[in-house]
Structures are given as structure tokens and as C-alpha cells.
Amino acid sequence: MITKESIENLSQRLNIVDIIENYIEVKKQGSSFVCICPFHADKNPSMHINPIKGFYHCFACKAGGDAFKFVMDYEKLSFADAVEKVASLSNFTLSYTKEKQENKKELKSILPSLNAYFKDNLKHHKEVLTYLYQRALNDKDIAKFELGFAGASEDSIRLLQNQKIPLEDAMSVGALKKDENNEFYASFIWRITFPIYDHKDLLVGFGGRTLNPNVPAKYVNSPQNILFDKSRIFYAFNIAKENIAKKKEIIVCEGYMDAIAFHKAGFNNAVAVLGTALTEHHLPLIRRYDAKVILCFDNDEAGLKAATRSAFLLSTNKIDGKVAILQGGKDPAELVAKNESTKLHNILDEGIELGEFYIRRLISTHSIISALDKQKALETIQKFTFNLEPLVANSYTSLVSNLLKVDEKFIVLSQNSKKTIQTPLISQNKYNFPKEKIHIAELELIAFLKQHPDICNDFKQISDSVCFKHKILLDKILEKKGYEDSDIREFESKNIRKNLNYSEFLLGICKVNLAFLNNVKIKNSTLALKKQLFTLIDKNLNLLIKNLNTAELNNFLKEYLSFLKYEKNEEILQQSFRNLNGIFGNKNFTAYDLGFSIQNNDEPF
């Protein structure tokens, strides 16, 4: 593992212009440099490079980042691989955490030895070969996907011992396990083996299928270990990646045999997940290939749930694609085995766009008989569409209108929708929040979260990243992304005050929440987002009682009450006033102390 200090030293010494010049012709323009952007069909130099700040930016496609990010995207490398490439181009010697690095290097040789044994062993088990032939596989398929067979546990252990491989090391890469008596046994016993490679063509684990109907677990994967993390890996990606790059499309299915079947049917860009659905850890790999995603899952409850979760994940992360559900209880392997590959082509062609699929699934979980039912369904949909780009969100207006049988004028799917840009929610609010101060305050709050990852859950309980202009950066901090992310590296290079205390942090979140409510212009006061924000602020008040002195709390409540004075939604008012009454009682001051009186109709109660 490369040390962070080594990466920082390399970052300070490298010249980003020199790095990019290794890939594209660069021309000087004033104090900066320009070049043709390699990340879109650029004809004029749209990419600008700032050698002082060490960042590039394309004004056409918005690609940008530091030298590491450029190499990652250009060569489709992981962060660690990109760092090594940049170091090589810069004649820089990186430092590694030696023990772990050397140990990992030794461990990488264990699984290939086992795989060679499994492949050879398959030849001696005709009953297993017969099963594979019955599943419409031939010798060419078996060789292409390196299928094998794991026999008795003692056979695998004997092989490892003969090759002088420490059994503890074999266990650390998932080849062995220990029983209740602390005795070693093989992870794969009497199973067909499917070797699993990562995106760098490193063998990191196996899948195994039993032919014994009495064994409850038909399929198993290698256990999680130093090499294998099933939430980050696709089966058959090593075979499919060239075609994924060419087609800019990836088919994601449920199992090993399904992925193999897709390849037999001519879909050489197919892979399989190793769990029930996609995870956020798969997204960087998909983005690296700029690929649209076709989800092809079974039409059972598990398949539909996996497709729904995956459609939400992809849509909200700006990845395009569609969902193709297999009907009739057949999976791709069955269709190919029965020479029905044409049906597979038709199923993929008739797939439903990701967002539309997710919205249809959401509505299917609601009764939409009464107007109130439809309002609740709409608010559920808004929780999804408010996470999308406005143009994308508004493209679903007609769909939602038709499904709910509600006029389009009542369908608001984007916070920035023209339908919502009317008069300000609070036109008389005298408390203005200077944009520059909010910008600085946000960065300070984000820096505090970066320093104290243990309070990320506190933040999620009392605010929402949608309130922040730096939403993408904040989400990355909340996801606990590290130095390998270019936005995090750029953020850490800024000179931001980082000596906040917890009470300042809480008060700062409240200020940002209120600033968002102050600036957003929402006609419909029952929108889910607005109700959610008021609820979050109310939750935050209880924390403020414990962490702010009376004067600080007094000042904040003045600003908060100025919003509530003009609120028309009874549900919001009742809940907020209940919370406020408790605060007034605890702090021994009243609404009158905050400048409100019945005589001038400013009394909030």
C-alpha cells in the first residue's frame, strides 16, 4: 500500500503539464495551458491546465481534477495504479507500507496454484463434465471461463502443503477455513469452481456450485479477505472489459451461469454481481468505462428487489441505463440452453429506462385511490427525483401524471422546477444570509466532518446534503472517501479553518438549513423536502439546548421563528411549536423575549 505521505510528496513535486503532455499535445495560452479534451469529442482546445494549482478543467464536458485523476480517467486505472504511473512518469520513488505490500505480493500466488489444480481435476470427473454439457457448455466455454472442480478438502490442503504454502496464508486469501476444533478445511469441497478476477486481471477468489441437492447452499463465494471484496467485483469482468470499453455498455446479471450464457449468446459485455445487487463500490468501475448499464435480473421477489435498489443507485449517481426483467421464470442460461437466444435479445431491447422502472416500482407499492393516497405516492417519488438533475427529474412528469392520473400542473419533481419558482416562501424575512459567508461556513462544517468522521451520523440526523451548495463534496465526506478521490485531495489543500467546536458545528448546520429555506422558492408548502428540513431543524433544537448558551440559542431562535411566522402548513407549525415550547420552558425565556407580541400579530402561538 502506498503511503499517504509519499503521495502528497509526489503531488507537490510533479508538474501536471508534463504529465498530460505524455498523452496529448499541450499549448501555452497566457499563464495557463490548453489542449484538446480527450474525454469527449472535442475539436477546439476546451481543456485548460493550471500548472500553479495543479488542476485541469474542461469547459465543455466539465471533466477536471489533478494529475492522478487525469491518468485514472485516461488509462482507466485505479487510484493506486494511477499514482504508480504518475510516479514513473515523474521519476519519483514511492514509499510503501512494506510489511503489507510484501505479504500481499506473496499471497497473490496462492489462488492461481489452486485454480490450476481445480481445472485439471475437472477432467477426471466425468459426471461434472456431463452436467456442464447438459447446461449447453462446451469445452471451449469451459476453457474460456476456466471452470474447474474442487474435490475433497484433504486434496486441496495436500496441494498447498506440497507447494510449501503456509496454511494460515491460504486461509488469509479465502482458500481455507477453520472448524470449531480449530482444524483447517477447504473453502470449496465437491463444487464446480468459477475463478473470479478483479479489473486488473488478478485472481482474487472463487465461486462454487454444488451438484448435491441435499446441500442447502447451492452457490458460495470466497469469504471476504485481503484480496476479495464481493461488493467491488464483477464476475467475468476480466473477459468482458474490452467489449465494455468498445460498446460503452455493460450488462449486469445475477449469476455465474447467466454471465456465461450471455457471452454464448453473443453479449460479450456481460458480467454478474456476486451478491444480490449493485453497490456504490461498483460505480467507479462503471464510470471508468463511461458505460450505460443494462440490469437483467430474474422476475422473482429477490430479482425485482435487486433491480429496484440498483436502478435507484445508478439513477441518483448519474449513470444511464435500463432494466430488462426476465419473464416466465427462465434465466439467461435456460434460454441459451434451449436455443432461445432471440428471446434474450428481445428482452434486452425492450428494457425500461432506470428512472422509469424505479418510479413504476414505487407507485406499485402504494394505493392510489384517494387524493391523499396520490399525494403520499407523489411525496415518495419526490424523495427520489429531488436527488436527480432538474432536467432528468422533470422528464418524468408525464409518466407520473399518467400513472397517478393527476394533472401535470400538480406534479413537481424538481426543486428547481419552473412550477416551483413563484414568490419566495418568506418574502418578508429580514434575516439575509450572505452567500460568501455561507460558502465559507459550509467548507468549515465539511472540514469538521472530515476531521471527526464519528459524527457523520449526527449530521445525517439533523440535516441533508441537499441544503449544501458543496453537495458532491459533502456526500463524499459522509461516505468516508479518502485521499484517492481528487475532490478530497483538492479540498484538503485549501486553507480552511478547522478549529470549530461541536456547538459551532451544530449551530452552523442550522444556519445552512435556514439559508437553504431562505433561498429556495417553493410554492407548495407541503413538499416532502420542506417538511423534512423543518423536521431536521426541530430535531437539532434538542441538541442545541445542550450545547449552546442562552444568548447563542436566543439569536438562532429569532431567525428560526421568522420563518415559522409565515408558515401555513398546520402540521409543520404544530410540531415546531411543541418543540419550541419545551425549549422556552427549559431556558426560562418566552416568545416575548425574542421580540414577538400579540399586539403586532407577531406572536407565533
From Swiss-Prot:
It is an enzyme of class 2 (transferase). Keywords: DNA replication, DNA-binding, DNA-directed RNA polymerase, Magnesium, Metal-binding, Nucleotidyltransferase, Primosome, Transcription, Transferase, Zinc, Zinc-finger. The keyword Acyltransferase does not apply. Binds 1 zinc ion per monomer. It holds the Pfam family Zn_ribbon_DnaG. Its cofactor is Zn(2+); Mg(2+). InterPro entries: DNA_primase_core_N_sf, DNA_primase_DnaG, DNA_primase_Znf_CHC2, DnaG_bac, DNAG_N, DnaG_primase, TOPRIM_DnaG_bac, TOPRIM_dom. Residues 248-329 form the Toprim domain. Gene3D superfamilies: 3.40.1360.10, DNA primase, catalytic core, N-terminal domain, Zinc finger, CHC2-type domain. It catalyses: ssDNA + n NTP = ssDNA/pppN(pN)n-1 hybrid + (n-1) diphosphate. Its EC number is 2.7.7.101. GO terms for biological process: DNA replication, synthesis of primer. GO terms for cellular component: cytoplasm; DNA-directed RNA polymerase complex; primosome complex. A zinc finger (CHC2-type) spans 37-61. Mg(2+) 1 binds at E254, D298. Disulfide bonds: none annotated. GO terms for molecular function: DNA binding; DNA-directed RNA polymerase activity; zinc ion binding. HAMAP family: DNA_primase_DnaG (MF_00974). RNA polymerase that catalyzes the synthesis of short RNA molecules used as primers for DNA polymerase during DNA replication. Belongs to the DnaG primase family. Monomer. Interacts with DnaB. Contains an N-terminal zinc-binding domain, a central core domain that contains the primase activity, and a C-terminal DnaB-binding domain. This is DNA primase.
